[in-house]
């Protein structure tokens, strides 16, 4: 377990002590609401694709949907820990399309997400969280590619 620096401790105490002013979200977290929406959209996308599949493939996609929900919860937690609040965010509606179109869409968006998470891994405070999310996103991409290889 790593030690917290004095700035982190100050922010935590500001959240605990109600008589102190609430700190403002750090600049690096300003994009988090969009990332949370992204993760919730992936959750819905995986559920939509799973509904069109069967067996182990559908189960794996439902597991990915649960991972995406967890990613959104982690990102909300980062918002709170950095002095903000847990934003209420709604995912982007998923289009109705064939499985192959949805898989291609999901894969392309996953590559963008991976690029964003790679940039955040150097973060001293939450880098480990971003690394864990990144590893899951990369595993999902590998599965999506395999699945795309089986679609006729």
Kindly label every feature range from the protein language model:
Residues 1-152:
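Non-heme di-metal
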């Amino acid at each position: 377990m790593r030690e917290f620096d004095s700035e982190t401790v100050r922010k935590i105490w500001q959240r605990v002590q109600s008589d102190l002013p609430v700190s403002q979200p750090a600049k690096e977290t300003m994009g988090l609401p969009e990332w949370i929406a992204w993760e919730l959209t992936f959750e819905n996308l995986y559920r939509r694709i799973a509904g069109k599949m069967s067996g182990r493939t559908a189960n794996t996609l439902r597991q990915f949907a649960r991972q995406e929900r967890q990613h959104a919860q982690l990102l909300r937690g980062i918002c709170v820990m950095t002095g903000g609040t847990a934003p209420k965010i709604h995912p982007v509606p998923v289009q109705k399309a064939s499985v192959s179109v949805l898989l291609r869409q999901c894969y392309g968006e996953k590559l963008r997400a991976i690029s964003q998470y790679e940039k955040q891994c150097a973060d001293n405070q939450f880098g480990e969280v971003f690394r864990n999310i990144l590893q899951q996103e990369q595993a999902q991409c590998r599965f999506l590619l395999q699945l795309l290889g089986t679609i006729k």
